[in-house]
């Protein structure tokens, strides 16, 4: 799971919010620690894995909204990794941007047909950014940092 490596290789610091393992073996979010770290460490961007990989936790609507509200309150951009959304067997996957209109201003949603359709070798994904300002910044970074585009996305 390369989140930490990607963060550090881009000159940023990791503020890890470790999941709480409950007695029944399930996992929960430590919301107090999550918000405390945002405030104390000046977090600007939150990488949210939903459903969680590798623990396969499907977050409830209330949990997702609580995270979203904390991020709204502190002006934190959310990168919502929803690449495993098609593999939910129990519960319902909660799409962050569908829960509240305000979340669209701070959310970058990542999806991919790779896992669902066994196409991981293509190394493609969908990046959905409703906010025009965020989208423009992202497009600029793609051009500056990657300097290469997949032939299938050139038209996009």
Positions of PLM-derived features:
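Substrate-binding/gating loop at the entrance of the active-site cleft, primarily
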Residues: 1-14, 149
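Aromatic/hydrophobic pocket-lining residues that form π-stacking "cages" and hydrophobic walls in ligand
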Residues: 3, 67, 96
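Hydrophobic/aromatic ligand-binding patch that stacks against planar heteroaromatic rings
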Residues: 5-7, 70, 99
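Short, glycine/charged-enriched secondary-structure capping and boundary segments
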Residues: 7-12, 30-31, 60-63, 91-95, ...
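Conserved core segment of the aminotransferase class I/II
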Residues: 9, 101-156
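A short helix->loop->beta-strand "cap" motif at the edges of active sites that frequently abuts
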Residues: 12, 73-77, 104-105
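Active-site phosphate-binding strand-loop segment of PLP-dependent enzymes
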Residues: 19-91
């Amino acid at each position: 799971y390369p989140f930490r490596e990607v963060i550090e290789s881009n000159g940023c610091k990791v503020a890890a919010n470790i999941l709480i393992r409950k007695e029944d073996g399930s996992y929960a979010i430590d919301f107090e620690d999550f918000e405390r770290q945002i405030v104390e460490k000046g977090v600007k961007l939150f990488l949210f894995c939903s459903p969680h990989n590798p623990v396969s936790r499907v977050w409830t609507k209330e949990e997702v909204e609580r995270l979203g509200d904390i991020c709204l309150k502190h002006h934190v951009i959310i990168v919502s990794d929803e690449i495993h959304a098609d593999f939910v067997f129990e519960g319902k996957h909660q799409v962050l941007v569908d829960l509240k209109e305000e979340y669209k201003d701070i959310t970058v949603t990542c999806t991919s047909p790779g896992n669902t359709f066994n196409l991981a070798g293509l190394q493609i994904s969908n990046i959905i950014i409703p906010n025009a300002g965020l989208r423009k910044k992202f497009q600029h970074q793609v051009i500056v940092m990657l300097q290469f585009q997949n032939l299938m996305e050139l038209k996009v």
